[in-house]
Regions:
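Short hydrophobic helices that act as membrane-entry/anchoring signals
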Residues: 1-11, 67, 71-74
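Helix-to-loop junction immediately C-terminal to a conserved catalytic motif
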Residues: 3-33
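Glycine-rich, highly charged phosphate/nucleotide-binding loops
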Residues: 10-14, 82-88
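Non-catalytic C-terminal accessory region of glycerolipid acyltransferases
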Residues: 25, 86-202
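Structured helix-beta-strand junction loops
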Residues: 9, 24, 49, 72-73, ...
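Short amphipathic alpha-helical segments and helix-helix/interface helices
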Residues: 3, 42, 67, 91, ...
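Short acidic-hydrophobic, aromatic-tinged amphipathic segments that line or gate anion-handling sites
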Residues: 15-16, 76-79, 163
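Catalytic core of membrane glycerolipid acyltransferases/transacylases, capturing the structured
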Residues: 22-82
């Protein structure tokens, strides 16, 4: 959080919906993904330490500086093709700490102004860990890998979604809320991750 004042200095932030942040309980921060700075933006908006799920390839194919950045964010490697028991165990370990979990349900960065191709894994994790999902939208940096100085970025926090809903309902509500907040088009599609196991197996 040392870098937070620098973000406020160099960028124009608008943060909406902080009143929707649950108090006194764990939850999953689930946002759309439009730039490399999204994890920092979500952490600034929520004002809590967040450990982010990241594809395992990021820990293998990038340089030291990039690796230090994702380590600083508390990121841990996951297999995007198949949700593994080890991932659920890592999430449950977070319950013993003051950290929250951060997920980008669409997987990689998407700048086509749509909410689609949502991975089912975040809903499985929410139900397995019994953590509600906090939908978050990020807009204003869709054209850039890194946000140019002076750009206006809006982070909006939606209403928490109960983990007690079915997986399909969780996915639907997340997609609808983020699309509404970002003014993106919501396209209902089948999950990209067909190998996700039912949460009862964990």
């Amino acid at each position: 959080f040392i870098a937070i004042p620098l973000f406020w200095l160099f960028y124009r932030f608008e943060i909406k919906g902080r009143e929707n942040i649950p108090k006194g309980k764990k939850f999953i921060c689930a946002a759309n993904h439009v730039s490399h700075l999204d994890p920092f933006l979500v952490s600034i908006a929520v004002k809590k330490p967040i450990a982010y799920m990241a594809k395992k390839e990021l820990f293998e194919d990038n340089g030291l500086i990039f690796r230090l950045n994702i380590d600083w964010l508390g990121a841990f490697a996951v297999n995007r093709q198949k949700l593994e028991v080890a991932t659920i165990k890592t999430v449950k370990e977070l319950y013993k700490t003051n950290w929250l979990l951060g997920i980008f349900p669409q997987g990689g960065i998407r700048r086509n102004h749509t909410i689609e191709k949502i991975n089912k894994g975040f809903a499985v994790i929410a139900k397995a860990a019994k953590w509600d999902v906090l939908p978050i939208s990020i807009t204003g940096c869709e054209k850039y890998n890194w946000i140019p100085f002076g750009a206006k970025v809006t982070v909006q926090i939606g209403k928490p979604i109960s983990y007690e809903l079915s997986q399909d309902e969780l996915i639907e509500q997340w997609g609808q809320q983020v699309a509404s907040m970002s003014h993106y088009k919501y396209i209902e599609t089948e999950s990209e991750n067909s190998e996700v196991q039912d949460q009862q197996e964990f």
